[in-house]
Amino acid sequence: MAAAAECDVVMAATEPELLDDQEAKREAETFKEQGNAYYAKKDYNEAYNYYTKAIDMCPKNASYYGNRAATLMMLGRFREALGDAQQSVRLDDSFVRGRLREGKCHLSLGNAMAACRSFQRALELDHKNAQAQQEFKNANAVMEYEKIAETDFEKRDFRKVVFCMDRALEFAPACHRFKILKAECLAMLGRYPEAQSVASDILRMDSTNADALYVRGLCLYYEDCIEKAVQFFVQALRMAPDHEKACIACRNAKALKAKKEDGNKAFKEGNYKLAYELYTEALGIDPNNIKTNAKLYCNRGTVNSKLRKLDDAIEDCTNAVKLDDTYIKAYLRRAQCYMDTEQYEEAVRDYEKVYQTEKTKEHKQLLKSAQLELKKSKRRDYYKILGVDKNASEDEIKKAYRKRALMHHPDRHSGASAEVQKEEEKKFKEVGEAFTILSDPKKKTRYDSGQDLDEEGTNMGDFDPNNIFKAFFGGPGGFSFEASGPGNFFFQFG
């Protein structure tokens, strides 16, 4: 900020004046010198006061306005500084430093095109001025960043817009427009604390800034604080009734809130079909609201689970965690659906994710239960082998054994190929194992609880299914198969 860092020490040439005018000029010059001393000590507030006194004594002196502009720039008061710089060049059109300060203020405020005109005028006055040459390049760079950002915003490439605005703000630190665009893109990227910080800084300087109010509301809206968001949108519209973005966001926020609440009410009343429809309608309102939509997907997944549409419920919960991979409730809901559909590996994976995030006793127990079911699912399913459910009675288990044992007995398949005989022998043995376990209350209890039966002293490796078969059908000679043509058998009981 070379133009701001130096104060002018030479007064502009004036025509001969009256004695009292000469006295005023001497007094003004004294004030200016005092201002310069404070400026050199970086006491810019005092420097400002003395330059103001100098201006009051000699309001037609361009350099005094130039000096006060430099001081205001150091204080970050660029809009006031611009007024002084413009006044300095109105008083002296050939005042190069005045043009540089005018351009620097324009650039700091984000008016790059106006800055270019000021720097061009400075170069016309002094074509070798290195500062004017560099600042002219800087102003053109800002215009280019602004142009790229506008295109990328339309493409929804928000990261690139943030990059361009960061570069532009290096030259235009007081430009609210650039800061607001950056904040809006940060919000679209889910970087809400950063976006809120930028918007809040602007609101501290200008509480009526509609764009900053809109961005604050947008952050709250995307964080699912919809009621608070609406308040900011309404305030932004009060400041700028034609603020299109705030109007759309306010409308979407109100619609989302209403649909979600109606869906929740229908769910609580047990009207799952209506709840499903309302959550679906809510999901169509604003695809950019990631957090709210994640909750809506999870809610709809819960509805689908109530309707026993478990695959649809799993899909909804998957969509929820895609939008918000920290959403514990969605992982829990999906894990339960996986359990209900006997997809135990997937359930274990979800419960592990939950437990790693929140190590509670409840989550630990859910994980252990899923791991147990997974272990059980990898053993032989004796209920499936016999074709009975887990609540089958003793008589039902016996009837099932009788049917399956006769179906797979090796003698029945003595005329089949070696491959078929081998498969039927295997099935016959499995049927015997299943009956041995499920017909014994203690063994059945251990099996149902997921205990390893071999570890409990029941070694099925030496098991002979024929012993069970003979005992069940009355011992040796009590039962025989007799072939009567292809595929027909007669059963003889003793």
UniProtKB/Swiss-Prot annotation:
Gene3D superfamilies: DnaJ domain, Tetratricopeptide repeat domain. Pfam families: DnaJ (PF00226), TPR_11 (PF13414), TPR_16 (PF13432), TPR_8 (PF13181). The modification Phosphoserine is found at S393. InterPro entries: DnaJ_domain, J_dom_sf, TPR-like_helical_dom_sf, TPR_rpt. Keywords: Acetylation, Chaperone, Cytoplasm, Cytoskeleton, Nucleus, Phosphoprotein, Repeat, TPR repeat. Acts as a co-chaperone regulating the molecular chaperones HSP70 and HSP90 in folding of steroid receptors, such as the glucocorticoid receptor and the progesterone receptor. Proposed to act as a recycling chaperone by facilitating the return of chaperone substrates to early stages of chaperoning if further folding is required. In vitro, induces ATP-independent dissociation of HSP90 but not of HSP70 from the chaperone-substrate complexes. Recruits NR1I3 to the cytoplasm. This is DnaJ homolog subfamily C member 7. The lineage of its organism: Eukaryota, Metazoa, Chordata, Craniata, Vertebrata.
